[in-house]
Amino acid sequence: DADTGYGNELNVTRTVREYERAGIAAIHIEDQASPKRCGHLDGKELIPLNEYVAKIRAAAAARHDPNFVIIARTDANAVTGFEDSINRANTALANGADIAFVEAPKTIDEVTAIPKRVKGPCLLNVVTGGITPDLNMADARDMGYRIAILPSLLTSAIMSACDKALADFKSTDMPPNSAHLPSVGDRFARFRADYWNEIRTKFHSS
């Protein structure tokens, strides 16, 4: 997620090169004005289409690896309407983007229409509690989406679990039942403590 590309076409050029150098496989750049907002919140503003196109063209030209994927995101649906979002997606694809990302469709009809009307591969953003209706991933594949991202899947679950644990502790004065939780060893193993312990053992000074 490269947001707006962090500036104009000059900044986008540098952003793409830095991301590619870091080993990133794909990048998405959007048409919001900076400072941007979450695509599922109100109050967004768009840059003009010609500025958006300039960024996409610069991004496509800046990559060295032809397999580095440029994803063009448009937030137009919430600002100027669904038709403009489709137009912006198709214009971005015609100017070098590999995948179109129409952010925040509001109805199942819009979700269904996007891969039919966009002239290239489409990405679906599934935000828990967001504007877009909940959708089974098998149905999304059948509609024609090539990629789906679920950016709030784990954060939402973590927030709910934390809220419940704190509420239970407040009401009972007891910590959660450890029988239902990972052990200390399991928690350290999840974050590869064994790897760091090997380094400690190998290089420990006596």
Regions found by a protein language model. Give the residues of each.
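Alpha/beta enzyme core
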Residues: 2-168, 196, 202-206
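Flexible C-terminal active-site loop/helix
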Residues: 169-206
